[in-house]
UniProtKB/Swiss-Prot annotation:
Covalent crosslink: Glycyl lysine isopeptide (Lys-Gly) (interchain with G-Cter in SUMO2): K260
Annotated segments matching region Disordered: 1-23
Lineage of origin: Eukaryota, Metazoa, Chordata, Craniata, Vertebrata
Main location: nucleus
UniProt function note: Required for mRNA export from the nucleus to the cytoplasm. Acts as an adapter that uses the DDX39B/UAP56-NFX1 pathway to ensure efficient mRNA export and delivering to the nuclear pore. Associates with spliced and unspliced mRNAs simultaneously with ALYREF/THOC4.
Pfam families hit by this protein: FYTT (PF07078)
Subunit details: Interacts with DDX39B/UAP56 and NXF1; interaction with DDX39B/UAP56 and NXF1 are mutually exclusive. Interacts with SSRP1; required for its recruitment to mRNAs. Interacts with CHTOP.
Motif (UAP56-binding motif): 26-44
Protein name as annotated: UAP56-interacting factor
InterPro entries found in the cross-reference section: FYTTD1
Positions of post-translational N-acetylmethionine modification: M1
GO biological process: mRNA export from nucleus
Organism: Rattus norvegicus
């Protein structure tokens, strides 16, 4: 044992000072038991793993504050509080606080940060926009302010338009009393196809009151019609007043010297008597009387031989 020790000492005499300390440690380990050597190795391993952490903890307070402000990490002072690194990870060797979010709650929290999936997305209301998308809310508010600034000042209406009590809307014929109008048109077409002239007169005052008063839907309106339907039937016996209308001149008037002068101003009366019968029946007439005609027919019937079943004609004697 002494020889081996003297050899090691002689060998380490020529080596630099750093390995000398290691050789002394090795000599101590030889004298130690196995359990002591394992404990010593564990201590040395821990010392080698923590120098980097100790260096970080020895940084100046100003530099730590600058880094925290830069990466958006809140300053936490006091013993036992967790410190967060640049990438958001908890540094080793620090005690975690109570009430750590784990499981489904942690997934929800990360989902809020990263973005919500379309399956679990909440309805897009003002509260949810403020909660999940604050930046978007700020942008929309700024856009609204710009729109309000750009919007021109509304021009005031004329006083006579404002003071009117019964302002008829522009789409009055479309919206108001649409069903009654359709009913009138159907009735008019039905009568017109049977040769009857139809004229509809709508009571405009009643229609205006209906539009102002009634705010109900179209299918709830009453079936009573405010219009008056008048039917005029052609009566040839009635005296019709002649309507004097000036003829339109499609071309320039012909000069007086070119027009033919009429020989007499008196109208020519046509000769003859007006016919009271069909003119086509004149050619069918003959000089034979009715008695002669019926006598010929009787003779023809008598000449025909009687059939077995008897005669179909009956002779009146």
């Amino acid at each position: 044992m002494n020889r081996f020790g003297t050899r090691l000492v002689g060998a380490t005499a020529t080596t630099p000072p750093a390995p000398k300390a290691r050789s002394n440690e090795n000599l101590d380990k030889i004298d130690m038991s196995l359990d002591e050597i394992i404990k010593l190795n564990r201590k040395e391993g821990k010392k080698q793993s923590f120098p980097r952490l100790n260096r970080r903890l020895q940084q100046s307070g100003a530099r730590q504050l600058r880094m925290r402000v830069r990466w958006g990490v809140q300053q936490s002072s006091g013993f036992g509080k967790t410190s967060v690194s640049r990438r958001g990870r908890v540094l080793p060797g620090k005690r975690r606080p109570y009430g750590v979010i784990t499981g489904l709650a942690a997934r929800k929290a990360t989902g809020i940060r990263k973005g919500i999936s379309p399956m679990n997305r909440p309805p897009l209301s003002d509260k949810n926009i403020e909660r999940y998308f604050p930046a978007l809310k700020r942008k929309t508010s700024l856009l609204r302010q710009n729109e309000v600034q750009r919007k021109p000042v509304a021009v005031l209406k004329r006083p006579n338009q404002l003071n009117r009590k019964n302002n008829i809307p522009a789409n009055f014929t479309r919206s108001g009393n649409k069903l009654s109008h359709q009913k009138d048109t159907r009735q008019a077409t039905f009568l017109f196809r049977r040769g009857l002239k139809v004229q509809t007169q709508l009571n405009t005052e009643q229609l205006i009151d209906d539009v102002v008063a009634k705010r109900t839907r179209q299918w709830r309106t009453s079936t009573t019609n405010g219009g008056i339907l008048t039917v005029s039937i052609d009566n040839p016996g009635a005296v019709q007043c002649p309507v004097t209308q000036k003829p339109r001149l499609t071309r320039t008037a012909v000069p007086s010297f070119l027009t033919k002068r009429e020989q007499s101003d008196v109208k020519k009366i046509p000769k003859g008597v007006p016919l009271q019968f069909d003119i086509n029946s004149v050619g069918k007439q003959t000089g034979m009387t009715l008695n002669e005609r019926f006598g010929i027919l009787k003779e023809q019937r008598a000449a025909l031989p009687f059939s077995k079943g008897g005669s179909r004609f009956v002779t009146v004697g």
